[in-house]
């Protein structure tokens, strides 16, 4: 395990979500009602950065072609509108362990 510091817990609590650079990766992190989540922030379809967090459904939508991902598992729930027959089971995103360590959000990469 290699825990990497990202942003302050206060900043994430205020923003609710953020795309952060960790080494050579961009990771989407979120704080939903005190629960922390982390997954790849680059859509597996066209390499766009994910953006729209739905706190109620725990999903994240890609801004480019509207693919929808489960924040907990990284599974693609809805394919991009430009590729409705895309194999959802093959286009999921990697999730990461995440923690609050003394006021800093850390991701295990």
Swiss-Prot record:
Cell compartment(s), UniProt: Cytoplasm
Keywords: 2Fe-2S, Cytoplasm, Electron transport, Iron, Iron-sulfur, Metal-binding, Oxidoreductase, Transport
Cofactor note (record): Binds 1 [2Fe-2S] cluster per subunit.
GO cellular component entries: cytoplasm
Primary location recorded for the protein, binned into one broad class: cytoplasm
Cofactor(s) for this UniProt protein: [2Fe-2S] cluster
Residues annotated as domain Rieske: 3-107
Superkingdom of the source species: Archaea
Residues bound to [2Fe-2S] cluster: 43, 45, 62, 65
One Gene Ontology MF term: metal ion binding
Annotated PROSITE patterns: RIESKE
Listed InterPro entries: Rieske_2Fe-2S (IPR017941), Rieske_2Fe-2S_sf (IPR036922), SDX-like (IPR053457)
Function: Not yet known.
Family classification: Belongs to the SDX family.
The protein's name: Sulredoxin
Organism: Sulfurisphaera tokodaii (strain DSM 16993 / JCM 10545 / NBRC 100140 / 7) (Sulfolobus tokodaii)
């Amino acid at each position: 395990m290699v825990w990497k510091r990202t942003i302050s817990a206060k900043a994430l609590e205020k923003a609710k979500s953020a795309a952060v650079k960790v080494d050579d990766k961009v990771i989407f992190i979120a704080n939903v009602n005190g629960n922390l989540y982390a997954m790849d922030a680059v859509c597996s379809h066209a390499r766009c950065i994910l953006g729209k967090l739905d706190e109620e459904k725990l999903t994240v939508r890609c801004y480019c072609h509207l693919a929808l991902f489960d924040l907990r598992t990284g599974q693609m729930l809805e394919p991009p509108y430009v590729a409705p027959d895309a194999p959802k089971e093959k286009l999921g995103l990697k999730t990461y362990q995440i923690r609050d360590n003394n006021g800093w959000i850390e991701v295990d990469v």
